[in-house]
UniProtKB/Swiss-Prot annotation:
Record's GO cellular component terms: plasma membrane
Organism classification: Bacteria, Pseudomonadati, Pseudomonadota, Alphaproteobacteria, Sphingomonadales
Name of the protein in its database record: Elongation factor 4
Keywords: Cell inner membrane, Cell membrane, GTP-binding, Hydrolase, Membrane, Nucleotide-binding, Protein biosynthesis
Keyword Aminoacyl-tRNA synthetase included in the entry's annotation: no
Domain tr-type G: 6-188
Gene3D superfamilies for the chain: 3.30.70.240, Elongation factor 4, C-terminal domain, Elongation Factor G (Translational Gtpase), domain 3, P-loop containing nucleotide triphosphate hydrolases, Translation factors
Role of this protein: Required for accurate and efficient protein synthesis under certain stress conditions. May act as a fidelity factor of the translation reaction, by catalyzing a one-codon backward translocation of tRNAs on improperly translocated ribosomes. Back-translocation proceeds from a post-translocation (POST) complex to a pre-translocation (PRE) complex, thus giving elongation factor G a second chance to translocate the tRNAs correctly. Binds to ribosomes in a GTP-dependent manner.
GO biological process: positive regulation of translation
Species of origin: Rhizorhabdus wittichii (strain DSM 6014 / CCUG 31198 / JCM 15750 / NBRC 105917 / EY 4224 / RW1)
SUPFAM superfamilies: EF-G C-terminal domain-like, P-loop containing nucleoside triphosphate hydrolases, Translation proteins
Amino acid sequence: MTVPLDRIRNFSIIAHIDHGKSTLADRLIQRTGGLTDREMSAQVLDNMDIEKERGITIKAQTVRLDYKAKDGQDYVLNLMDTPGHVDFAYEVSRSLAACEGALLVVDAAQGVEAQTLANVYQSIEHDHEIVPVINKIDLPAAEPDKVKAEIEDIIGLPADDAVLASAKSGIGIDEILEAIVARIPAPKGDPAAPLKAMLVDSWYDPYLGVVILIRVVEGTIRKGQQIKFMQADTVHLVDRVGCFRPKIEQLGEMGPGEIGFITAQIKEVSQTAVGDTITDARKPTAEPLPGFKEVQPVVFCGLFPVDAADFEKLRESLYKLRLNDASFSFEAESSAALGFGFRCGFLGLLHLEIIQERLTREYDLDLITTAPSVVYRLHLSHSKTEDAKVIELHNPADMPDPNRIDMIEEPWIEATIYVPDEYLGSLLKLCQDRRGIQKNLTYVGGRAQITYELPLNEVVFDFYDRLKSISRGYASFDYHQIGYREGDLVKMSIMVNGEPVDALSMIVHRAAAEARGRHMCERLKDLIPRHLFKIPVQAAIGGKVIARETIAAMRKDVTAKCYGGDATRKRKLLEKQKEGKKRMREYGNVNIPQEAFIAALRMGDEG
């Protein structure tokens, strides 16, 4: 039995990290009787440990709440818990497209932040009804009136009827539920039309196979039905239809406006693309839903096991993670310095950190991560054997012959940064140093909102950490890609004892190459232990060395056992030592410890 359309409310919660989104979701579940107090654990919807610890939501989750409103009617409220971080922007856009409205949760002490803004604008684009909720009003530092003014000034939403709440103390929860029923519109859709449903998310369950989260737009979906994924062009048989309350409950069928899950004996998440349209295989709908796009990795880096024997374990672990997260890619690669490993592609830096942390934590692996790099476009001129063409470069070590390169293009982003006035100067300097182009600067209350265009290459390294450190953690930052532009870029190689170390090679802007190279050489000089012979550490572009440091040799005092007597005896011993050192330098291997790699890749303030 499907639920009548006018009794359904689909909504998401938009909030910046730590503004209380998951806690509010917990309270709503508790208030509507989804779980008893005993079963309630903090952050019910955040399943991964990392999600709970970092206080972030990575995968979209959903829960169906039954609520008896004050008008005496029973309503079904579907809450979509969306990721709040910029790396998962596409997942957010699909989750928002599955709803008709949103709760905008803003911390009463901290006010509106950059990520909130990005998601609110997406929500407004979907024509959502937005209900502002000012959370944490019981904090001593809470300033609800100031935050209301911020919501009106920055976002342009009327905030006089914002709900004041404290999810932690349970204040204002009933008012929020009533506001959802009264202000968020009911979904539309024709139950008799051919099935059209949106694939919102999918994850792998060891018992059920791939579980697919869907929002039915038109028609009905039931057990035993043959369905077709329109983008993937595959046909499957539905063997389960259900919803989360948040415990799994099986349903016979789902109609328009309903959100729930299906399973269809699918083995790999990679077959289920987020945003795909699901329809009836026998009676398909004419048009797929708009807005689908392939998720492309943005940041690439190499992952190598510290112990070479862990290579197979790393491969298995990556396959297992891939079951749950089709948005990252990997392929095997080998490096002279680090042995065998994988070149992995991620949606952004947070995504990279999360995958890395899950590998260390859940699969107990010790890993070395090479410098993150972005995808460059190389325009190659024609040679005797090949025509002119454009190629994508993921790994600086694969750079072709510089003489063939006509032009290198790099990805650029538009960043929106909020920062308190007193840190504005150092923030502008940081953006300037990173080749940023200032587009806009406005003041809201005591904070500046700055819009900058920046090369993504300059941001992936340590921009976020520097931003947080110069603003004492008060700045918030959000970005989106704006396409490729030509750049004066060169490949910088690091050579130790005349041998290039491929794991440390990187693509840099020509103007910054010398400073970056000098910094890297100084760093390695301190990190590589002394050997019995002199070791030159050089940074080079092509054949030209742009920076050099020398690690002095350890010296054994060979003349210690000579007492007085003839000076030629001493000279003979010293000459012999000199010969030995020369031979050693030619054939000796320099042992670079793993810590040196990791520390060298973490550029400091001067980088």
